Amino acid sequence: VEDRMREPEEIDKLDLERYGLAHLEGSNLLALTGPDMDKLLNTLGEEDISLIVPLPCTPDNIQRVLSYSECRRCGDCCIPNPLNPASPGVEVFEDEAKSIADHLHTTEEALRNMTTQGKIVPYPFQPTKLSFTRWLPLPCPFHIEEPNSCRIYPVRPIVCQVHPIIFTGDEASFAIKVNCDYGKDLVKSAFAYVRENDPELEIKL
């Protein structure tokens, strides 16, 4: 019989007892609802722990999950995260940098001077295509604090387009950050979709 149980990822760092969640130990994460799920998501958000969604990381699945709710445009993803002070910023692919420069009517060199060197990574949804990346610092220089808007919104990087979804490098899944209400909504709806399509799958806490 195929084992339909998956081990939790980052969530295993969470001390359930410390947060009054000891009664959830051994529970199926995918089946949690109501106050228990709300308290767990709030706690994970406070600890900056993302949740893995056991769905293939495909454009269709990403768009499906993003459609479950709407971004509140709080702007928190555009500023430094106090729980992750070592974050280098917003990752931008080379072709995205060119689009941003064109949108701002500036040169690629000028934009490059605003960033730091990134790394070579597979392009999202195209694992055979490698691309250099750059890091935009936080707070993002294109974030307008009042009224929480973006100077490059039409050409914003893919990491901004799909936030709070995070690419993990695993084609079999992706993660969702839950330190905003939008992320919490997406997790609840994504888990409901997984339960509906794979009712035997379990992720034990």
What are these regions (language model features)?
Residues 1-205:
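Short loop/turn segments that flank or connect secondary-structure elements
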